[in-house]
């Protein structure tokens, strides 16, 4: 699934960030997170208006959707795997899949499993 991009079309922002951008990036990360904001977030932050509009959309999808969190994550994992989006797949496995109780076998099935495999 690995695809390395050495020259992205839109490069993510690197620290130090402008104060407004820093505030947006901190809202996207878990409270007290020590890690650098995700590359996806730093790329969205290149366009501050887009960045400010994406948080409510993401929050709505992840926090207020009609699909149960476990099923949502299975769909996201499978979609990321099929699209070769290894980075995003890994983020969702660690941040959501494991905490929601998906087993290693279920997570592996999102990459290597057939459509009819139970997850």
What do these predicted regions represent?
Residues 1-71, 118:
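Secretory/endomembrane lumenal or extracellular ectodomains immediately following the signal peptide
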Residues 60-64, 82, 113:
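Alpha-helix C-capping/helix-to-loop hinge sites
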Residues 71-108:
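Conserved alpha-helical segments that form or flank metal/cofactor-binding pockets of metalloenzymes
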Residues 113-119:
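Short, intrinsically disordered, charge-balanced linker/junction segments flanking boundaries
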């Amino acid at each position: 699934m690995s695809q390395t991009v050495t020259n992205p079309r839109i490069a993510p922002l690197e620290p130090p960030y402008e104060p407004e951008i820093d505030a947006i990036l901190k809202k996207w990360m878990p409270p007290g997170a020590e890690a650098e904001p995700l590359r996806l977030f730093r790329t969205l932050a290149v366009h501050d208006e887009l960045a400010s509009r994406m948080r409510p959309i993401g929050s709505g999808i992840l926090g207020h959707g009609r699909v149960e969190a476990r099923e949502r994550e299975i769909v996201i994992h499978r979609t990321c795997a099929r699209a070769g989006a290894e980075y995003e797949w890994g983020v969702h496995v660690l941040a959501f899949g494991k905490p929601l109780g998906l087993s290693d076998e279920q997570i592996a099935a999102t990459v290597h499993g057939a459509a009819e495999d139970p997850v």
